[in-house]
Amino acid sequence: TGIMLKSSEYKIDGFWYYFDENGQFVAGRWINHHNADYYYDEQGHMYYGWKQEGDKTYYLNKGNGKKVIGEKKIDGFWYYFNENGEMATGWSQHNDHMYYYQANGQMTYGEAKIDGHWYYFKEKSGIMATGWSKHNNHTYYYQLNGWMTYGEKKIDGKWYYFHERTGVMATGWSKHNGHTY
């Protein structure tokens, strides 16, 4: 005689299985238990790693199988998974900051041209820069929407000039359109 497993997980021959309220092992579907989502493959094994479902991508922790929600560093790259565990691509606002995730889900760092506009994403955090930024041994100014500034710009009551192609702030004396900078 044996004990029927119900609404619990059990390790058999090195694989974790989940048994539902009727004692049947779950296969090929998501289960929520321990306040987290898990996926069990067609053989009933707990699933780990990347999971693609249609146009949505998920990641299940390699150590415990939990679906990731929030920021996660995977193989040296940062990703973001929304409240449903779906991997972010494109623009994402969280932690009171803007970020941009590439088509493969990896966080963007440094200068990036997106939809025809140049942005700068801080090297350590990936946060979109606004206001003054010093990088590549130059000074730049990014508008509130993150766009790099070009040409003449009055900032805090002072006029500045930013190169028309590179956005680099002019240093030393420079005259443009009747203004001396």
Language-model-derived ranges and their functions:
Residues 1-181:
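Extracellular adhesion/carbohydrate-binding repeat motifs centered on closely spaced tryptophans
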